[in-house]
Amino acid sequence: MQKRLTLLGSTGSIGDSTLDVVARHPERFSVYALTAHRNGDKLVEQCLRFAPEVAVVGDANTAAHVEAKLRAAGSKTIVLYGPQALVDVSKSDGCDTVVAAIVGAAGLAPSLAAARAGKRILLANKESLVMSGAIFMDAVRDHGAILLPVDSEHNAIFQCMPRDENEHGGISKIILTASGGPFRTREPATLADVTPDEACKHPNWVMGRKISVDSATMMNKGLEVIEAHWIFGLAGDRIDVLIHPQSVIHSLVSYRDGSVLAQLGNPDMRTPIAHALAFPERVDAGVDQLDLAQIVQLSFEKPDYTRFPCLALALKALEEGGIASAALNAANEIAVEAFLERRIGFMAIAATVDAVLNALPNRSPNGLDDVLAADAEARRLAAEIIAKAPAPRVERTV
C-alpha cells in the first residue's frame, strides 16, 4: 500500500534527502503536503515535481508569492500559511506518515499533532523530545502512533536493538557516536575567533547552518542524548557519547553478555530516511555501498568537555529534568542565531546557554503550556544576555 506523506520542512537538507528517496520509489510513496518557512521558490519547484495537495509556508506574503507561481504553472496545489496550517496538515486524514524535519522549537506543535492523530512519525525534529519528552511519548503511546527515528544515530540504535521491548533488559548501554565537528583538533585558545562559515563546514555531513553550528559546539550530540533517553527509555547514565571522526559507525548498542552491535554506512542521511520510510522493509536509498576495504582507519576518543562545554550543559540539563532541557534548547537557538548573524562570538554560545540555565529556576512542567512558557522565558533571557554581550572579535583578513 502506498504511503501518503506530509513532509514538514521540505526545503531543508532532510527534506531534500527525503524527496530524493521518495522520487526513487513512486510506487511506494506519494506526497500529500509539503511545508517551508520562507523558501518559497524552492517550495514551488518541489510542488511542481511532486504535486502535493497542500503546501504550507510561514506567512501571507510568501503564500501569495507561492500561489501565484503555482497557478501560473497550472498547479492546483492549495497554499496555506501559519502555525495552525502546519498542525492541520500533520493530523489530516490525507496522510498516514509525517516526516518531522522542521528545525527547532517550531516543529513541536505539528509533530505533537501528528502523534495525537496516531500517525506514523519519522522524527528528525529532536527538539520535540528535548522540549517535551514525556508529553510527546505519552501522546505516541496513548494514540497508537508509530515513532521511527530519522537522526542517523538514533536510527542506528533502533536498527541494533531487539524489536521486542521485553528484551530491552539485556541492554547495558547505548553509545552515540559523534564526528567531533570541524574543531575537534583546533587549539582551544583560538575558538573565540571561529567564524560562522568555519563552523558550518562539517567534515563529513551535509547539513543546514543551524545544525552545523550545533555539531561544531557538540550541542547537537547533547540534544541527541536527551532524545535517546526518551525514545529508548534509558537513563542518562546508560547513554554514552564517543567521538568517531570517520562517521562510518553511526552508533552502537552494548549488551550485558559483552556483545556490541553497531550500524555502519556511508555518511548520507538518505540511508536512515529510507530505512524509516520503508520500515520494516528495505529499499534503495541511492547511497553507495560501504567499501570496508577502502577504510584506512576507524578511531575513537572520549569527548573533551572543556572544548565542548555545550555537551556538558546538555547532559546536566537531562540530569536535572523539569524544564531544564526546554530552556537549554531555547537559549541555544537564540545564541546560535546571534552567532550566525555575527552578533556574538562562537564561545559565547555556551556562555549564553549556561547563563540562562543559571538564571531560570527549574520546575516540573504540568503540561505543554508550562513547557512553552519556559521556552519563551529562556528565549527572552538569552536575548537580554546577548544584547549586553561585548561585540565579537573582528574577523581577520589576509
UniProtKB/Swiss-Prot annotation:
Q: What class of enzyme is it?
A: oxidoreductase
Which cofactors go with this protein?
Mg(2+); Mn(2+)
Q: In which pathway does it act?
A: Isoprenoid biosynthesis; isopentenyl diphosphate biosynthesis via DXP pathway; isopentenyl diphosphate from 1-deoxy-D-xylulose 5-phosphate: step 1/6
Q: Which Gene3D superfamilies match?
A: 1.10.1740.10, NAD(P)-binding Rossmann-like Domain
Reaction(s) catalysed by this chain's protein: 2-C-methyl-D-erythritol 4-phosphate + NADP(+) = 1-deoxy-D-xylulose 5-phosphate + NADPH + H(+)
| Residues that bind 1-deoxy-D-xylulose 5-phosphate | 126, 152-153, 179, 202, 215, 220-221, 224
Name residues in a coiled coil: none
UniProt xrefs under InterPro entries: DXP_reductoisomerase, DXP_reductoisomerase_C, DXP_reductoisomerase_N, DXPR_C, DXPR_C_sf, NAD(P)-bd_dom_sf
Q: Explain the purpose of this protein.
A: Catalyzes the NADPH-dependent rearrangement and reduction of 1-deoxy-D-xylulose-5-phosphate (DXP) to 2-C-methyl-D-erythritol 4-phosphate (MEP).
Q: Which family, according to the similarity comment?
A: Belongs to the DXR family.
This protein is called: 1-deoxy-D-xylulose 5-phosphate reductoisomerase
